[in-house]
């Protein structure tokens, strides 16, 4: 018995070292960024190469190289060109995928600038990009060879300094968040620094982030805009800002986003990061976020703290909106005959992959929204922008309304799992 225990402990001891060995064998401790264009309409999509960019920092894990979540509308893989072995993979979503569900996408084509990042390969690789089909399955859409000896790899310039907000851990063993200013002028950089510390404390006020305070790094980048604020098109307000953010994205007032993702990446490259969060210097109510893409929200609205936490739930943990009675631009974001990939909503098509095992047998399904079930994990109809056919795990949660001050147990668990993936 003692011999078996010793063998198991030795296995646990050497397992992380094996991961580090694979990283060192195949990757440099810096970032390769693939910029590309992604276009199409409601029915079709196409890709076109833009540029290879080398960035100086790699903040990601050296052991969690292969995605284990299968979240996102898209995914990509880095495969060794000689053996075909998958060396690195991640899931993600983009603004283009949301636009495809709007009315406009049935009338015209649009093209968006996108990118994916990975540790810099030491040897030639093939990078494959995948997109989910109508059934929710990944299909390969684009493939590119990469050679680290390519003389046309752009060396990313670093025009802006970064500063530490909260940095207790080695980037390789931490979740690294970079805060980027939008609509802060040079004279407002002191305010941006204060906002960075304010929102860092906001993050650590919520479970489960407060349980990982020593494993989360937060940095800010001093990147000023020429003008203060953000665009509000319907009011004729246009600001000259670094990231071209605007209210009324897809015609929805509170949806504050930017389609200039290349500019976002160029600024983010100035610091080590896993996740990008953009703070917009405006008292308006708004924000937005997309999984493994970026999050963005206002700095001084009275609800700014909860907006920040809600939006980071989208971009970091892949959480879905659980509300269904607010204005959105999307049409059938979630087909009712397909199980959504997000961990906190279900169509019951494959409920066994979600929180089914956490629902008491005695609970009715669907679970009525009644006070006696206020603290019960159940199957509550309404979520993902639909009143019927999509279900959420809790009556209320920060992914639903701001009447509550906490995430539900299912969202907490999803956030916790994602943090653990980054820090190991």
Q: Which positions does each model-derived feature cover?
A:
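Bacterial Sec-dependent N-terminal signal peptides
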Residues: 1-23
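Beta-strand-enriched, solvent-exposed domains that form extended recognition/catalytic surfaces
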Residues: 26-151
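Fold-level signature of zinc-dependent metallopeptidase catalytic domains
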Residues: 152-207, 220-230
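Solvent-exposed loop/turn segments at secondary-structure junctions
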Residues: 183-186, 224-228, 282-286, 302-304, ...
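Short pre-active-site segment immediately N-terminal to the catalytic Zn-binding motif
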Residues: 191, 287-311
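Active-site-proximal segments of metallohydrolase catalytic domains
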Residues: 215-291
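Catalytic Zn2+-binding segment of zinc metalloproteases
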Residues: 312-328
């Amino acid at each position: 018995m003692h011999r078996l225990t010793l063998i198991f402990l030795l296995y646990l001891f050497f397992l992380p070292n094996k991961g580090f060995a694979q990283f060192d064998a195949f990757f440099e401790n810096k970032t390769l960024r693939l910029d590309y264009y992604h276009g199409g309409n409601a029915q079709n999509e196409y890709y076109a190469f833009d540029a290879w960019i080398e960035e100086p920092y790699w903040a990601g894990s050296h052991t969690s190289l292969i995605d284990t979540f299968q979240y996102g509308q898209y995914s990509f893989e880095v495969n060794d060109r000689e053996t075909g072995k998958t060396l690195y993979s991640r899931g993600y979503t983009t603004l283009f995928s949301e636009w495809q569900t709007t009315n406009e996408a049935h009338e015209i084509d649009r093209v968006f600038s996108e990118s994916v990042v990975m540790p810099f390969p030491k040897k030639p690789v093939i990078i494959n990009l995948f997109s989910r089909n109508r059934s929710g399955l990944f299909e390969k859409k684009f493939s590119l060879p990469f050679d680290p000896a390519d003389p046309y790899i752009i060396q990313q310039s670093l025009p802006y300094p970064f500063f530490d907000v909260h940095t207790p851990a080695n980037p390789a063993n931490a979740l690294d968040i970079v805060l980027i200013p939008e609509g802060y002028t040079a004279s407002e950089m002191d305010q941006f620094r204060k906002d960075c510390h304010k929102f860092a404390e906001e993050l650590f006020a919520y479970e489960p982030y407060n349980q990982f305070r020593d494993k989360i790094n937060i940095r800010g980048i001093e990147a000023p805009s020429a003008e203060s604020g953000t665009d509000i098109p319907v009011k004729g307000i246009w600001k000259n800002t670094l990231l071209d953010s605007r209210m009324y994205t897809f015609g929805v007032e509170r949806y504050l986003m930017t389609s200039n993702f290349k500019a976002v990446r160029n600024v983010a490259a100035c610091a080590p990061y896993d996740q990008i969060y953009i703070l917009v210097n405006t008292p308006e109510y708004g924000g937005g976020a997309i999984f493994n893409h970026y999050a963005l929200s206002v700095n001084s609205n009275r609800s700014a703290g909860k907006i920040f936490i809600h939006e980071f739930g989208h971009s970091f943990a892949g959480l879905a909106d659980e509300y269904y009675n607010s204005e959105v631009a999307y049409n059938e974001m979630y087909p009712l005959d397909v199980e959504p990939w997000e961990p906190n909503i279900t169509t019951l098509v494959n409920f066994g992959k979600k929180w089914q095992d956490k629902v008491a047998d005695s609970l009715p399904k669907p679970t009525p929204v009644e006070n006696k079930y206020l603290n019960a994990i159940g199957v509550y109809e309404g979520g993902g922008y639909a009143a019927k056919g999509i279900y959420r795990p809790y009556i209320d949660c920060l992914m639903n309304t701001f009447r509550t001050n906490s995430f539900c147990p299912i969202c907490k668990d999803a956030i916790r799992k994602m943090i653990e993936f980054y820090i190991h």
